Amino acid sequence: MTTWLLLVVCLGIACQGITSVTVRENSPRKLANSMNVIHEWKYLDYDFGSDERRQAAMQSGEYDHTKNYPFDVDQWRGMTFVTVPRYKGVPSSLNVISEKIGNGGRLLQPYPDWSWANYKDCSGIVSAYKIAIDKFDRLWILDSGIINNTQPMCSPKLHVFDLNTSHQLKQVVMPHDIAVNASTGNGGLVSLVVQAMDPVNTIVYMADDKGDALIVYQNSDESFHRLTSNTFDYDPKYIKMMDAGESFTAQDGIFGMALSPMTNNLYYSPLSSRSLYYVNTKPFMKSEYGANNVQYQGVQDIFNTESIAKIMSKNGVLFFGLMNNSAIGCWNEHQPLQRENMDMVAQNEETLQTVVAMKMMHLPQSNKMNRMHRMNRVNRVNRMDRMDRIDRMDRMDRMDTMDTMDRIDRMDRMDRIDRIDRMHTMDTMDTMDRTDKMSSMDRMDRMDRVDRMDTMDRTDKMSSMDRMDRMDRVDTMDTMDTMDRMDRMDRMDRMDRMDRMDTMDRTDKMSRIDRMDKIDRMDRMDRTNRMDRMNRMNRQMNEYMMALSMKLQKFINNDYNFNEVNFRILGANVNDLIMNTRCANSDNQNNNQNKHNN
């Protein structure tokens, strides 16, 4: 059965948003062990190809292990992507985790290759913050163009790669008036969400945390829109944050975002805030950006702490990192957006210090599970192919049967027509025979009468002959009238027989049509039942969450201890996470799920 993986990236940096959830005492869930560590690093290192090249990179300042911090993670098939914001000493900003292991952990390989790590002429990938993989196997990369978190090196861009070929499909350079706040001149693109309806009709939402704006990119016409709202601004009350008991200051606006596949709501929070907001994206799909069309909603101060990373499950459960709690919280969007409807699904002060990235995965991390998923998918496809072939054979058999019935009907009609023709011929011959016989008898009668008349007086004979002629004419007319009536009756009988035969033919055709309609309805019902079964199987698929965690305050203060683990990628089954929580399925959710599927 296909599963999804929720990828949570935890950095040794403290996140700033914690929900108002609290861990219930006597809870049967072991929150400390609810997520499994997949990868971990003391520091990030790269596969340079040889020790000589690594030493040369270190001596030139191209690589400095103290300046490399993971910021986002995603997975496609066997590749796990990791982004590293560009600082001096970062050799590559977009990478995949290799099979090679160094002193710090798994080595990173630049994606697609080392040539794209060259940023000085702005032709490569300068500084990748967030990435997203859509359902059409495309990798979207948000390149801020900023190095050292402050210096604009190149114009911000969107890079799009085909993951099947690792070839770039598109590179979109953002206009300056879109990328920065015109009033303050500030700008910093740090987060993106991709909404792909089809390969052309795709929308990308980007968060500008320094310029307090939401940028919308329409792939169909390559247009940009910069949206502003006070819900994007940071809250002055929360610019001083706490992480693992240490405080730091940040004045960042809209940051973490998540898109609901069920309601099309885009959920977001400013980094320096404890509020949760959302906007419905349907107006954006229609290119309606007016104030009357776009409505921003949400609840202020709904969290107990700041929240950075957010992700949405396919069933409408929002997961969010809780900075000062070293935890991950949840809320089911089928419930009212209230503090009491939120809950905590994972908490660990060692492995979940600050969750800076989370992803939902279509496939589990295990290769064995991947193979099982592919085998199940192939078996389902083969079963559907076999059923389609059987349906086609059944239709062909029915068509052959109908052809045979049509041939039999035509032969029956021809036989009936032949019989009618023969009957008509025989009737005609009988009529002629009767007429000949009657004529012969009339002639004999007349001869007899003539003989008798010879013995009679001529006058009497003449009178008698006149009377007889008149009688003969009357008899002949009566005979003709009788024959005409018989012919009319025969014709009426034949017409009645033909009408009855036509009625029988029409009845037979109607019966065949009714049978075919019933068969078609049964076929449609069978196909519908198969689709329903497939939909039920899809709804029953598991999801896996993957998270990236690190110590945020260490990142800001640049005082990591690289002799201990600082960065971790963790994973967990979503159903296991939300089990026995307020975020589990409800009747309201099931009803909304059915409406969404319809």
UniProtKB/Swiss-Prot annotation:
What is the induction note for this entry?
Answer: Unlike other major royal jelly proteins, not down-regulated by the ecdysteroid 20-hydroxyecdysone (ecdysterone or 20E).
Q: Which InterPro entries match?
A: 6-blade_b-propeller_TolB-like (IPR011042), Royal_jelly/protein_yellow (IPR017996)
| Subcellular location(s) of the protein | Secreted
Q: Which residues form the signal peptide?
A: 1-17
What does the entry list under GO cellular component? extracellular region
Q: State the Pfam families in the record.
A: MRJP (PF03022)
Q: Give the family per the record.
A: Belongs to the major royal jelly protein family.
What is the name of the protein in this document?
Major royal jelly protein 5
Source organism: Apis mellifera
